[in-house]
Structure formats: C-alpha cells, structure tokens
Amino acid sequence: MLGFLEKVADYTKEAVSAAKYLVDGLGVTFDHMRRRPVTVQYPYEKLIPSERYRGRIHYEFDKCIACEVCVRVCPINLPVVDWVMNKETKKKELRNYSIDFGACIFCGNCVEYCPTNCLSMTEEYELSAFDRHSLNYDNVALGRLPTSVTSDPSVRPLRELPYLPKGIMDPHELPANQLRAGKLPSQIIKELQADKSEEEGKNNSSDMVPNKLNSTNK
C-alpha cells in the first residue's frame, strides 16, 4: 500500500511539472499571438526608426576641438583622438578621430556630453562586415551621412507599430497621406514657438492700451 501511494505521489509531481512547462510554452505562444501579424520583407521593406534612435555615430571634423570629453565619458574609453600641440597658437591640433563600432555599445554618452555638438546619432544600423577591423571608422567614414529610409527609392518605408493610427496593425495597408499617430519633435517645437509668439503679441497689445490712455489724459 505504501509503495502504491509513493507511485501516485511521483505521478502527481510529474503531472504538475508537465502542466507547468505546458503553461510556460503556451505563454510564449499567446504573447506572440498578440503581436503584429505581418512581418517586414527586409531588405526591400524597412521600418522607419524613431526620432531618438541610437544608430551609427556621425562626426563633424571641423567642429571638434580635441577636448577628449567623449573619451572620458565613454564607459570603455572607445574614441581615439589623435592630436598634437601647436606651439605657435598653443592649441590642440586635431589629426585623426576614430571609433571602433565592433566594441561600441551605442550608449550615446559621447553625443550627450560633446561641448561643440560635433557628434550625433544617425538611424544607420546596418554595420555588418566580414572583417572586424573594417568596423573601425576613421573621421572620413564617420563624416558620411547615411541614406534615410524615407528617402531611399529602393526601399519601402514602413512605420513602427506605436506610430500607426489607433486600430491599425498592418503598416502595408496604411495610405501614404495618412496622418501618423503622435507628433514629430519638429512639429511640437513649431507649435510651442507659435504659442509663445501669440502670448508675446497679447502682452505687447495689453501694454499699449495704458500708454494710449495716458497720452489722451495729457
């Protein structure tokens, strides 16, 4: 009798563990079922990156002052700044600048803390190469701007799911003239500037009214 009860207990434990594994697997399945039903046919179709996407770093040689702030704030001290001291002007003279994207973690610290804004993040993410040494970009390679997804004639740009209008899951069925969900940062800035100019105009008009009254009293 005791042996039978032990077998029943072992069978129950195995059944419970099997049910747990089954629920875990179905959880992954149900999670994918709630996602977008249509995939992107890459590389003929590409998703439009977000406005704050951290892609390949763009570098402007003329703006760089060789302060090496980017090197100090980098978690792995990645940027290589080659400069010499000009004895006549007693200033740093930049010779070369390079970043190894094989080791870069794209944290954006160098872009955030650059005092002259000579570094910026682009939307380029296609950095695959057969040789890892080719991922070491010098100042010439860093100075090239990538082709935008929306301006590339050989690619069909598609919006990300958060930028689609409410109720639409498939970006392929969205008309080109359909308004996107949310506003671009440039649109928000323009609206804020317009509101600010309206407030300034109202304040100026209110200041002019007492001046006119004073002139009439005189």
Curated annotation (Swiss-Prot):
Signal peptide: none annotated. Its EC number is 7.1.1.-. One of its GO terms (cellular component) is plasma membrane-derived thylakoid membrane. It comes from the Bacteria. GO terms for molecular function: 4 iron, 4 sulfur cluster binding; iron ion binding; NADH dehydrogenase (ubiquinone) activity; quinone binding. Residues 55-84, 95-124 form the 4Fe-4S ferredoxin-type domain. Binds 2 [4Fe-4S] clusters per subunit. The keyword Iron applies. Its main location: membrane. Belongs to the complex I 23 kDa subunit family. NDH-1 is composed of at least 11 different subunits. This is NAD(P)H-quinone oxidoreductase subunit I. It comes from Prochlorococcus marinus (strain NATL2A). The lineage of its organism: Bacteria, Bacillati, Cyanobacteriota, Cyanophyceae, Synechococcales. The gene is ndhI.
